[in-house]
Amino acid sequence: MNVIEGGVAAPNAKIAIVISRFNSFINESLLSGAIDTLKRFGQVSEENITVVRCPGAVELPLVAQRVAKTAKYDAIVSLGSVIRGGTPHFEYVCSECNKGLAQVSLEYSIPVAFGVLTVDTIDQAIERAGTKAGNKGAEAALSALEMINVLSQIES
């Protein structure tokens, strides 16, 4: 029986990080966690990491699609945060962001790691951006690295 599993070291990988500016006080912590993880665990050099900023979570799929279309990158890490308010807007934003990023991954056959927080409160966002609940940006970066290696093994 063959088992394919991916490690996280990918020293030659080119990674794009697409990040929303809205809620930047949270997202910058996610970005720091992602970059640190790519460099320390993935052994990805800084010159192989590109950060692309966009206004909000709704714009992440289009930016990720344009990045994927260039075929310059081995994976995309998407980062952002959507905090529930008093209207249905939260559900629409989260749903469209999630579906759009998944569509990019399938359309371009590239890992698109989901590091977009979808939380009820600012406190939950803070917890997931590097305090009590870890750093979801770092987790998304690990997922991207592992997927690069899994797909590489499948194709070889």
UniProtKB/Swiss-Prot annotation:
Residues binding (2S)-2-hydroxy-3-oxobutyl phosphate, per UniProt: 86-87, 128
Lineage: Bacteria, Pseudomonadati, Pseudomonadota, Gammaproteobacteria, Vibrionales
Domain of life: Bacteria
Role noted for this protein: Catalyzes the formation of 6,7-dimethyl-8-ribityllumazine by condensation of 5-amino-6-(D-ribitylamino)uracil with 3,4-dihydroxy-2-butanone 4-phosphate. This is the penultimate step in the biosynthesis of riboflavin.
UniProt binding sites for 5-amino-6-(D-ribitylamino)uracil: 22, 57-59, 81-83, 114
Protein name (Swiss-Prot/TrEMBL): 6,7-dimethyl-8-ribityllumazine synthase
InterPro entries: LS, LS/RS, LS/RS_sf
Self-association and partners: Forms an icosahedral capsid composed of 60 subunits, arranged as a dodecamer of pentamers.
Transmembrane portions of the chain: none
Biological or metabolic pathway of the protein: Cofactor biosynthesis; riboflavin biosynthesis; riboflavin from 2-hydroxy-3-oxobutyl phosphate and 5-amino-6-(D-ribitylamino)uracil: step 1/2
Active site: 89 (proton donor)
Keyword Transferase among record annotations: yes
CDD domains with a match to the protein in the record: Lumazine_synthase-I
Organism: Aliivibrio salmonicida (strain LFI1238)
Family matches, as NCBIfam families: lumazine-synth (TIGR00114), PRK00061.1-4 (NF000812)
Family per similarity comment: Belongs to the DMRL synthase family.
Catalysed reaction, written as an equation: (2S)-2-hydroxy-3-oxobutyl phosphate + 5-amino-6-(D-ribitylamino)uracil = 6,7-dimethyl-8-(1-D-ribityl)lumazine + phosphate + 2 H2O + H(+)
EC numbers on record: 2.5.1.78
A single MF term (Gene Ontology): 6,7-dimethyl-8-ribityllumazine synthase activity
GO cellular component, one term: cytosol
Keywords assigned by UniProt, alphabetized: Riboflavin biosynthesis, Transferase
Listed GO biological process terms: riboflavin biosynthetic process
